[in-house]
């Protein structure tokens, strides 16, 4: 079995330096073009495609695979950044952002890196059980 993971293309929040987390922002034109370019080069012979239900991931998916039959799964949704969601990254110190990146700090109301690891690992195990 071959498994390919594709991250969503550039979103408006990526471009603007805003914490997205679970916010349902759209791709930029640059992001859509990048995903379409990937779609021109990637093999499209897949048995199954899974996708996060967020708008930016769906837009990336359909730019690459316009007619994809897809299973949406909340377990592969982006990490919740709690109170940081929809705020400018520059509002937080570099040190605090680095601690978050390393999984040593969780924003108030946010999801721990351990929680993300568990739900994503559960997803991967389920997929491998189903197709192995």
Model-found features: residue ranges?
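Extreme N-terminal starter segment of soluble prokaryotic enzymes
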Residues: 1-4
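Short amphipathic alpha-helical/adjacent loop interface patches that line ligand
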Residues: 35, 120-124
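Active-site-proximal alpha-helix that buttresses catalytic centers in soluble enzyme cores
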Residues: 6-68, 95, 109-115
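Phosphate-handling substructures
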Residues: 64-121
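A short hydrophobic/aromatic micro-motif that marks alpha-helical segments and, especially, helix-coil
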Residues: 23, 126-127
